[in-house]
């Protein structure tokens, strides 16, 4: 992993913070456009940048909050793209995969993903999430 130049990182952070403000204002479409803009600012290959993973997770979290599964899948794939190179957040990625599978109604795959997370990291990834995910997991164990 290479560290981004400070000025570029500050520019990306500003775009990401604006995306978050747009989300808080209820404008998911504009929010996602700014997340996309932040993503496009990373030099290729984007999977070399730890910060690119952060941009993707911010976007996927906004998509989950809005139950926008189509866009969540795009950003989840980007999280995986970066993580496949850096291998830093396997449990976090698996937890988000479980949430996506749950929301898509693929409950067997959701349970499998959540079970892997719990075996790797315990239940800490459920702490700041809607209780439906942990309740689902506990109900299947």
Kindly give the residue locations of the regions a language model identified.
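TPR/TPR-like (Sel1-like) alpha-helical repeat modules
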Residues: 102-125
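Alpha-helical adaptor scaffolds
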Residues: 24, 43-88
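Amphipathic alpha-helical segments of tetratricopeptide repeats
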Residues: 36-42, 76-83, 116-122
């Amino acid at each position: 992993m290479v560290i981004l130049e400070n000025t570029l990182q500050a520019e990306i952070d500003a775009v990401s913070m604006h995306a978050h403000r747009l989300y808080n204002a209820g404008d998911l479409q504009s929010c996602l456009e700014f997340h996309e803009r932040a993503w496009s600012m990373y030099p290729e290959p984007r999977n070399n940048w730890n910060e690119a993973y952060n941009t993707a997770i911010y976007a996927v979290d906004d998509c989950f909050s809005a139950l926008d599964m189509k866009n969540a899948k795009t950003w989840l794939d980007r999280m995986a793209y970066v993580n496949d190179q850096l291998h830093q957040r396997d449990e976090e990625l698996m937890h988000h995969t479980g949430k996506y599978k749950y929301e898509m109604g693929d409950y067997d795959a959701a349970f499998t993903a959540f079970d892997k997370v719990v075996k790797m990291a315990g239940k800490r990834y459920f702490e700041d999430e809607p209780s439906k995910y942990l309740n689902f997991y506990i109900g299947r164990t």
